Amino acid sequence: MAMTPQLAFSRMPPGFRFQPTDEQLVVDYLQRRTAAQPCVTPDITDIDVYNVDPWQLPAMAMYGSDHDRYFFTMAAREAQARRTTPSGFWKPTGTKKTIFVVAGGHEVPTAVKRRFVFYLGHHQPSGSNNNNKTSWIMHEYRLMNSPRAAVPSSSSVNRLPTDDLTEEMVLCRISNKDLPKPPFIHNSLLQFSSVGLNGDGYNYLILDHLEPPAMEYPNVGIGNVDDAAAGTDDPGDLDEEIDDSMQRNHGG
């Protein structure tokens, strides 16, 4: 039987919530997924993220926390990547962040994280004022020197290739900060005896009951913001700092 979001939640302890750090996403999920090794929790959803409007994605996710949902997808190599959906496009904002993983006592650059904001409509020339910015955010994680991705054991995406060197497996975190948090029942830490590849245990699995919120098209949250400049003055950089601070507060 195919795994569905409802079935995935039903198999988790009451109050399960998924809240990994950037390093844990890279080491325990993206690296293991590209190596065809089992991940910590079953089935982060495989889907063509770039061909689906963001408000359709939350209902397709197996796991998430607060405003976040996680997906594996095949993406074109960075230079050829196109991120256009039926209703709009994902626009990069801020600066790329290198994710370091501790190996052999040294911090090794392992992946790159990049932030995108979803805009309704078609691409506009750089520097133009675009009033169709929404509240949908995507953080895209790519391995540096990415190996060829393996076919998932179960996937709704039939196009995932094994031998196309123009594409690579990436992990996407989709969120909408303007949407209300889902209802939580518990507020305690779920500890596991098994230890992750990074040696600190799976302490990012939190006991907080989560029901996927209804995220529909009217809630896209259009704003009047011009973020054409992509540098240290970009609002995305401040959001990155806030995002990193929140991860540290959760033990990342």
From Swiss-Prot:
Give me the Gene Ontology terms describing cellular component.
cytoplasm; nucleus
Domain NAC residue range list: 12-177
Which GO molecular-function terms appear in the entry? sequence-specific DNA binding
Q: Which residues bind DNA?
A: 110-183
Q: Which stretches of sequence are listed as region Disordered?
A: 225-252
Report disulfide bridges, numbered on this chain. none
Q: List GO BP terms, alphabetically.
A: regulation of DNA-templated transcription; regulation of seed development
Statement: the UniProt record of this protein carries the keyword DNA-binding: yes
Which tissues carry this protein? Expressed in stems and panicles. Expressed in developing endosperm.
Q: What's one Pfam family the UniProt record gives for this protein?
A: NAM
Question: What's in the keyword line of the UniProt record?
Answer: Cytoplasm, DNA-binding, Nucleus, Transcription, Transcription regulation
Tell me where in or outside the cell this protein is found. Nucleus; Cytoplasm
Q: Where is the composition biased (Acidic residues)?
A: 234-244
What job does the chain carry out?
Answer: Transcription factor involved in the regulation of seed size. Binds to DNA-specific sequences of CLPD1 and OAT promoters in vitro.
Q: How does it assemble?
A: Forms heterodimers with NAC26.
Give the comment on domains: The NAC domain includes a DNA binding domain and a dimerization domain.
**Protein name in UniProt:** NAC domain-containing protein 23
